[in-house]
């Protein structure tokens, strides 16, 4: 999320993320999200590998949101979910190699998400939690029409 109107780039604002070069490395970036600080970078040899790369952060957002959404639902239902673990991988594949894709030209971004649920859950509960994972807000954003507006300030 970014804002473009003056006065709305307050780093303490919960709905604003600011990314700025650190100039301590080739591509190292300081990320400020509310009161939280993160570092992003490109892996060596392109960058200095000082932090996760942008796709790692994208996958982390989806994985965290998925796990949190499942946890909230299971807790609300008082189901015996002990642990959620989400493993994600990003790849770019040829569109022609994607059987379920509408696009047949160029490349498709593909995210493989595996969810491990630990606890004494029955099959119906596990199936329901798999459906709930699809309702994670980050998943909804990634699978909806997204528009990014960019401006120079």
Q: Which residues are covered by each model-predicted region?
A:
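Extended beta-strand/beta-hairpin segments
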Residues: 1-60, 71-153
């Amino acid at each position: 999320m970014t804002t473009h109107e003056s006065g709305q780039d307050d780093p303490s604002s919960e709905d604003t993320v600011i990314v700025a070069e650190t100039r301590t490395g080739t591509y190292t970036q300081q990320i400020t999200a509310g009161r939280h600080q993160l570092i992003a970078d490109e892996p060596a040899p392109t960058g200095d590998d000082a932090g996760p790369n942008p796709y790692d952060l994208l996958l982390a957002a989806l994985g965290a949101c998925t796990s949190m959404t499942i946890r909230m639902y299971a807790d609300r239902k008082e189901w015996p979910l002990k642990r959620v673990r989400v493993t994600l991988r990003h790849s770019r594949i040829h569109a022609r190699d994607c059987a379920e894709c509408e696009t047949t030209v160029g490349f498709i971004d593909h995210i493989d998400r595996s969810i491990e649920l630990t606890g004494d859950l029955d099959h119906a509960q596990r199936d329901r939690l798999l459906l709930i994972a699809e309702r994670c807000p980050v998943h909804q954003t990634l699978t909806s029409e997204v528009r990014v507006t960019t401006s120079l300030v």
